[in-house]
Amino acid sequence: MDNSNTAIYIRVKGQRPKGFVDPLPFEWNLEKEKRLWSIISTLDSNRQQINWKLLSETIEVPEYFLKERSYTLFSNNLQKLGKFIDNNNTSNDPSKVIPGTSQTGDYSNLKALDVSKGSMDGKDMCQDMKEINDPNYVDYDVDNEDETAELTLQKLQTSKILTQQNPMKIRSKERKEEFQETSDADLWSSLSVSTSALEEALMDRMHI
């Protein structure tokens, strides 16, 4: 018992209200408080009701005091629970953790990773060693596109890709030659027919 949870009644002079009864003296100790808390803290749902009259008779404490004391116990425990939650959230918040320490407060040796610009160059990291060792490998440089295009053209010419004849041109040439041969044959055929006809006509005219 202390000043924060002890009710003090002061008797003053004057007429008592009608039906007023002096509260009976009672004893309140830690054992009774634990017993009260064990009962009110184990309620399963709002449907369960406390029989304050029976509880008052069992603990031998006035009913009004049990209700007030129950409210005080719940209030104190809720405050403790709120502080516990606040402390737990603070310890688990990464923004509130001291740099160089873990969330549990243990210090760890953190080494800074020094990454230079050259070590993270994607060109150096992505090049294949087989391509670099290839004599026909051409390194593409964005800053010198003309030189790169010229080198690429030279590589294509040396690899005989551009020197090969176009298959479409070859087919067109073959078709043209076939058409020319066919035209010549038809012409000679028609000439031979005309010559034969002229010979027959001359023979008839000459009555041979």
Curated annotation (Swiss-Prot):
An example Gene Ontology CC term for this record: Atg1/ULK1 kinase complex
GO biological process, one term: protein transport
Protein name: Autophagy-related protein 29
GO MF term set: SNARE binding
Entries under InterPro entries matching the protein: ATG29, Atg29_N, ATG29_sf
UniProt cross-references to Pfam families, sorted A to Z: ATG29_N (PF18388)
Cellular location(s): Preautophagosomal structure
Homology family: Belongs to the ATG29 family.
Stated role: Plays a role in autophagy. Functions at the preautophagosomal structure (PAS) in order to form normal autophagosomes under starvation conditions. Also plays a role in mitophagy and regulation of filamentous growth.
Top-level taxon: Eukaryota
Record keywords, A-Z: Autophagy, Protein transport, Transport
Tagged with keyword Transport: yes
Entry keyword annotation includes Transport: yes
Provenance organism: Vanderwaltozyma polyspora (strain ATCC 22028 / DSM 70294 / BCRC 21397 / CBS 2163 / NBRC 10782 / NRRL Y-8283 / UCD 57-17)
